[in-house]
Amino acid sequence: MAKEISSELLNTILTRVGGPGNIASCGNCMTRLRLGVHDSSLVDPNIKTLEGVKGVILTSDQVQVVFGPGKAHRAAKAMSELLGDAPVQDAAEIAAQNKRQLKAKQTSGVQQFLAKFATIFTPLIPGFIAAGLLLGIATLIATVMHVPADAQGTLPDALNFMKVFSKGLFTFLVILVGYNAAQAFGGTGVNGAIIAALFLLGYNPAATTGYYAGFHDFFGLPIDPRGNIIGVLIAAWACARIEGMVRRFMPDDLDMLLTSLITLLITATLAYLIIMPLGGWLFEGMSWLFMHLNSNPFGCAVLAGLFLIAVVFGVHQGFIPVYLALMDSQGFNSLFPILSMAGAGQVGAALALYWRAQPHSALRSQVRGAIIPGLLGVGEPLIYGVTLPRMKPFVTACLGGAAGGLFIGLIAWWGLPMGLNSAFGPSGLVALPLMTSAQGILPAMAVYAGGILVAWVCGFIFTTLFGCRNVNLD
């Protein structure tokens, strides 16, 4: 049974972030409790010393408390219940806080824009992982047992049943993204879902598959619903903005009847005329860029080496649209295993620190508590509890990840590109059965395992040689 987050711990965290009156919002991603704050000067950074807290990330308007997978959701739910009993603030306090919030938005616009991706995609990640694991296990069984694609019987039926979830997810994914994106940008979710469905419909009357829209051009202009996720994100943003403008001038009595109607008509027109072509060009450009980086060993090394820094700044969710674009263009996510090497490099760095530390030191205890999650692809406990506070090991961990990325890039350059079978999934050792390639699942698993091994070894060596000098090993 999952261990609950104690109310004492949450009350202590609440006190150290300035009390209920300093909380602007409460949410979570996969591993972090995210508390929006009005005044960051009231936040005590020593939250990270509390037992049960694996790390803390502070920005100008947000406190991110690292708990780990599963626990973050429970912490956010319990914290929301605590905040439900918070005292109401007076108008002067609210006005002062709004001023501070506005200033914070002006100084962290890029970070807040990228945070939108977390709002859009984080609710979908458990589904990505579940569908990807089922597909990976089914593919592995079919490969090992040599089950033909057209085989009949109980086992083939069971394997097809395990694969159907991935097909369903990716067939209708744009609708889920459209719904979440419209809400994230301040609009109505169902309007975003309807607009996203326009990208899913077919506009070729001669096609024998798909869902025909009923027309093949838009008042004589050709329709080309390319761009998929990129176009849907742009369209959902436009839909939310248009809805806000329409609602501003709509009488209250007509709001429910006409606001969505007018919003959909205007947004759909923009989608057919501008957004679909624009999304297609952006999609092709993004796919070309990252496919060429993926096939360039040095590009892979740079991507893997910098990914831990993206995690620290909380902008790693910005890669998810790229993952989806690569799934559309390649049939697998070739970027994800490259970026996963960052976590493997950190495991090697942590093992080096453990080796160099004193037998009964606090550092060894910290590594023991964080190494298993690290091996399984959950890197935050190692980042915030072990490597980042000591800085040099964090740098050598990045170098270890870069070495793993270089290895995968070299293998792709030599003719065996591989990737994740889903847009998103677990990293670390858990991701092994999710790897796939044109040559099959077993070669892809071997390449990924080789990359992890290279990152472990290089992270260990770099940290032993360069990451332990003048570093606190107690």
UniProtKB/Swiss-Prot annotation:
The active site is at C29. Its EC number is 2.7.1.192. The chain crosses the membrane at residues 124-144, 158-178, 181-201, 218-238, 261-281, 302-322, 335-355, 369-389, 394-414, 441-461. One of its GO terms (molecular function) is protein-phosphocysteine-N-acetylmuramate phosphotransferase system transporter activity. It is found in: Cell inner membrane. The keyword Coiled coil does not apply. GO terms for cellular component: plasma membrane. CDD domains: PTS_IIB_glc. It catalyses: N-acetyl-beta-D-muramate(out) + N(pros)-phospho-L-histidyl-[protein] = N-acetyl-beta-D-muramate 6-phosphate(in) + L-histidyl-[protein]. Residues 145-157, 202-217, 282-301, 356-368, 415-440 are periplasmic. One of its GO terms (biological process) is phosphoenolpyruvate-dependent sugar phosphotransferase system. Residues 115-474 form the PTS EIIC type-1 domain. InterPro entries: Glu_permease_IIB, PTrfase_EIIB_Cys, PTS_EIIC, PTS_EIIC_1, PTS_IIB_1, PTS_Sugar-Specific_Components. It is a multi-pass membrane protein. Keywords: Cell inner membrane, Cell membrane, Kinase, Membrane, Phosphotransferase system, Sugar transport, Transferase, Transmembrane, Transmembrane helix, Transport. Residues 1-89 form the PTS EIIB type-1 domain. Residues 1-123, 179-180, 239-260, 323-334, 390-393, 462-474 are cytoplasmic. PANTHER family: PHOSPHOTRANSFERASE SYSTEM TRANSPORT PROTEIN, PTS SYSTEM N-ACETYLMURAMIC ACID-SPECIFIC EIIBC COMPONENT. The phosphoenolpyruvate-dependent sugar phosphotransferase system (sugar PTS), a major carbohydrate active transport system, catalyzes the phosphorylation of incoming sugar substrates concomitantly with their translocation across the cell membrane. This system is involved in N-acetylmuramic acid (MurNAc) transport, yielding cytoplasmic MurNAc-6-P. Is also able to take up anhydro-N-acetylmuramic acid (anhMurNAc), but cannot phosphorylate the carbon 6, probably because of the 1,6-anhydro ring. The EIIB domain is phosphorylated by phospho-EIIA on a cysteinyl or histidyl residue, depending on the transported sugar. Then, it transfers the phosphoryl group to the sugar substrate concomitantly with the sugar uptake processed by the EIIC domain. This is PTS system N-acetylmuramic acid-specific EIIBC component. It comes from Shigella flexneri.
